[in-house]
From Swiss-Prot:
Signal peptide interval: 1-30
Entry's EC annotation: 3.4.-.-
An example Gene Ontology CC term for this record: extracellular region
Stated name of the protein: Peptidoglycan DL-endopeptidase CwlO
Active site per database record: C377 (nucleophile), H431 (proton acceptor), N443
Organism: Bacillus subtilis (strain 168)
Molecular function GO labels: cysteine-type peptidase activity; endopeptidase activity
Note: The N-terminal part of CwlO was shown to have no cell wall-binding activity.
Activity regulation, free text: Detected in exponentially growing cells, the 50 and 30 kDa processing products disappear upon entry into stationary phase with the concomitant appearance of a 20 kDa products. The 50 kDa form persists in the absence of extracellular proteases.
Amino acid sequence: MRKSLITLGLASVIGTSSFLIPFTSKTASAETLDEKKQKIESKQSEVASSIEAKEKELTELQENQSKIEKELKDINDKALDTSNKIEDKKEENDKTKEEIKKLKKEIKETEARIEKRNEILKKRVRSLQESGGSQGYIDVLLGSTSFGDFISRATAVSSIVDADKDLIKQQEQDKAKLEDSEADLNDKLKEVQAALAKLETMQKDLDKQLNEKDKLFDEAKASQKKTAKAISELKSEASELANQKANTEAEQARIKKEQEAAAALIKKQEEAQKASDETQTDDSQTATTESSKASSSDDSSDNSSDNSSNGSSNSSSNGSSSKKSSGSNSNSGGTVISNSGGIEGAISVGSSIVGQSPYKFGGGRTQSDINNRIFDCSSFVRWAYASAGVNLGPVGGTTTDTLVGRGQAVSASEMKRGDLVFFDTYKTNGHVGIYLGNGTFLNDNTSHGVSVDSMSNPYWKAAFKGVVRRVVQ
């Protein structure tokens, strides 16, 4: 009977192991996908912030371009107005020059007439001097035939003299007037030329401003184009990240579904194992009863045989009792093992393979895995403490579910070095490690294998629900 029960137990363990091995990659993938999703969401946040900043930058560039366009229009209007004024001043300048030229011609003509008249007067004076001066006038008067003729001749002579004087005076006045007009026109010409020079300087300055604004306008357009392109690229990246996140979530959902199915199957197998253990206990009790009856029968028939049988029965009973008691101790909860060096011994042994031991779901349950230092989280904790003389369960039967029942529960605020800390990863209490103090713990995880991690890490912080067990003190 015992042999058949052992065979059944081995078959159960082998069956469970064959199921756990392919499940390893799924658990690892689930945790890796969580990290990937966190990275994607972090990148999405960065991209969203970049898009917002770039869109704000684009708006500012567009506003700046509109401002430059208005300034360009104002400068262009001023340049056009200045150009028209320059043309008007040039025309006025040419007209003034023409008027000056005309006045100069008139002045020369007047001067010529005055000069001509002066020559005539000079001849008359010369003639009078040659003829005796006043004697000539007397001869004219004495040559009159009557008194009336005398009066007429005297009046005529006086009129000629006065006319010559008036003509000379008028010519002098005309000349002075022309010279004044010429001076006025020269002053006007200077003013026109000064205004023209000022306008031309203004035109050059406006042309310079136009060139500068054109350059700024081109730069603004180029910046807008560059920023718009950056926004387009960021939006494409955001779209790609959204697709990656959707794919990751879909993969997470698929793995979660498979894990739930696997967990259900494991639970079913555990229930079957429990039923098998109960059957084994019942069979053991039946065998003991039958053996006792047989022993009593032997006692009644033979004294010497009775003593021998009793010795054998006692030996068997003691052995059975010892084994049962040992099994109870290894699986019982609520007992804190006293081992002063166990904690530091376990931590020392476990720390010795940090960074050197890969994670394997279901690993550490064969001698080959143990020799090669290949564990999962629960088998690593069991091995570390076992190496320090603390028994937390059998090699093939220690899981997070059995470890969470070991020792005594303590609050997270009271946990200390050596306590077991549990995390809700792919299931409740799906991961376990040894608390080191200062917010760190020693564990074997899918990402880094055996490592020392911080409980303030966002992933572990979210997974830690305050489950702590003290197994050694």
